[in-house]
Amino acid sequence: MYNILKKSFYKQKSLDVASSLLGKMLLFNQHKGIITETEAYIGQDDQAAHSFHGYTKRTAVMFGNPGFSYVYLIYGMYHCLNVVTEPEGFPAAILIRSIILLSKNTPHTKVNGPGKICKILDITKEHNNIDMTANHSFCICDTNLNIDDYICTPRIGISKATDKFWRFVIPDVTSLQYIDTKLVPTLT
């Protein structure tokens, strides 16, 4: 059985959530993936965040309750999955950039890039603004993996606020590609 991360987890400071999501398991329908890379987008002062320009129809979910999905389209063709963090009213979200997609066989597949994740899992804008703390088919779960070895780098693919080291990456995911699926929570 798996334990879905609760609202209290997402209500913490975004940088803490971003690093703590490493090693957690993203569940979407029948797919399971270990999160290996995240990026934080925090507040209205973060020029790279969608919330920089304030509250809009598109960014409303970022200002909402922690633990909700924020899915949007970039370049008119790639969906990106984020999860909202911080207390309601403060706009922040964590972008899921890379996962190890678990399968019955090893090695498991490394899926790097938020657009690739959404394409493979079939996550679309229809999955925007879903409470990931209450949905057993679309959530992030705790695992028994203890990830202490990660690095912080500047966020990538942006042109503003490039000085912020708000990208969190597990530098060597080789061991996760061969992880025994019995060591991670199972669906019931």
From Swiss-Prot:
One Pfam family in the UniProt entry: Pur_DNA_glyco
GO BP, sorted A to Z: base-excision repair
EC number: 3.2.2.-
Transmembrane segments: none
Protein family membership: Belongs to the DNA glycosylase MPG family.
NCBIfam families xrefs: 3mg, PRK00802.1-4
Protein name in UniProt: Putative 3-methyladenine DNA glycosylase
UniProt organism field: Ehrlichia ruminantium (strain Welgevonden)
